[in-house]
Amino acid sequence: MLKEFREFAMKGNVVDLAVGVIIGAAFGAIVTSLVGDVIMPLIGAVTGGLDFSNYFTPLSKAVTATNLADAKKQGAVLAWGSFLTLTINFIIIAFVLFLVIRAINTLKRKEEAAPAAPPKPSAEVELLTEIRDLLKKS
């Protein structure tokens, strides 16, 4: 049973999937940083220095805090600023994934469209060609 599992785990699809998950996690961290550290501050600068990650709507009168972390400690809040940031994050990841898949599909189509090389003539055909060429010379 262990041998069977090892064979299953070493199949190309399983290994490819594992590599894809690891690369996807790393890419997700990069996009999260891009959104949180680059895009959202730029949007905040354009909109007058707003920090969307701290935008929330209190769902309880007990919530009097002005930042999200303290507000969550005081009671229920609707953290729509965090949701907005994560939505932008998702859109960027989905768009980049679309571009990658589109590029892969374009490459596949080019490979399929490329004409196949003509098959090498058989030994008999090569021999007959040589005989013909010799007869032409004489």
UniProtKB/Swiss-Prot annotation:
Molecular function terms, GO-annotated: mechanosensitive monoatomic ion channel activity
InterPro entries, sorted: Mechanosensitive_channel_CS (IPR019823), MS_channel (IPR001185), MSC/AndL (IPR037673), MscL_channel (IPR036019)
Superkingdom assignment: Bacteria
Subcellular location: Cell inner membrane
Topology of this chain in the membrane: Multi-pass membrane protein
Pfam entry (one): MscL
Gene Ontology annotations for the cellular component aspect, listed alphabetically: membrane; plasma membrane
Biological processes, Gene Ontology terms: monoatomic ion transport
Family in the record: Belongs to the MscL family.
HAMAP family xref list: MscL
NCBIfam families: mscL, PRK00567.1-4, PRK13952.1
Function: Channel that opens in response to stretch forces in the membrane lipid bilayer. May participate in the regulation of osmotic pressure changes within the cell.
Name of the protein: Large-conductance mechanosensitive channel
